[in-house]
């Protein structure tokens, strides 16, 4: 019964919650439905706004489908939806509070979800070239990744802090 309940908790699954503590004196439950730190999808539901995005979340399997607002989507990403690479591989090579690096390989372009909270101040580079990050499923990051073997670097650029840094009292 608990496994069925966990499979229906999209938010904790797409945020890669691997363990759930129900009572402090018991072993944590292993969540076999956690999506992982990054995964490719072959279906995207485009919606006009955040309210529609939240509504659609109840209808999807986050392992296969992302909900993305129209303003984040570019038509050139459509080719990635017809070519789900079952041999797609991605691994984290560096993880720190302000920077995450990955290596990935794919035989075709992919739409990839990342189990990291979306903030506009995060930027992404693929092999040193800027690439947009999309907000998906209301809270996580997603990106279009080209085919091949590539390095990804996501880093946090605190614009307000950097603007205020030269100001001293």
Language-model-detected regions and their locations in the chain:
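Active-site-proximal, structured, solvent-exposed surfaces of multi-pass membrane proteins
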Residues: 6, 63-169
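Extracytoplasmic
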Residues: 1-85, 107, 127
């Amino acid at each position: 019964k608990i496994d069925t309940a966990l499979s229906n908790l999209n938010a904790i699954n797409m945020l890669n919650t691997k363990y759930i503590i129900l009572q402090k004196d018991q072993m944590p439950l292993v969540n076999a439905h956690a999506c992982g730190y990054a995964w490719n999808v072959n279906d995207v539901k485009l919606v006009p706004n955040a309210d529609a995005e939240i509504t659609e979340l109840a209808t999807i399997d986050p392992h296969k489908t992302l909900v993305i607002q129209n303003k984040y989507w570019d038509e050139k990403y459509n080719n990635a939806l017809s070519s789900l690479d079952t041999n797609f591989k991605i691994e984290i090579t560096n993880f720190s509070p302000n920077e995450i690096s990955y290596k990935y390989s794919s035989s075709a372009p992919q739409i990839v979800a990342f189990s990291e909270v979306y903030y506009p101040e995060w930027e992404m580079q693929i092999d040193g070239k800027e690439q947009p990050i999309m907000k998906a499923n209301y809270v996580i990051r997603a990106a279009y990744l080209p085919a091949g073997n590539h390095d990804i670097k996501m880093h946090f650029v605190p614009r307000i802090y950097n603007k205020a840094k030269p100001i001293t009292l």
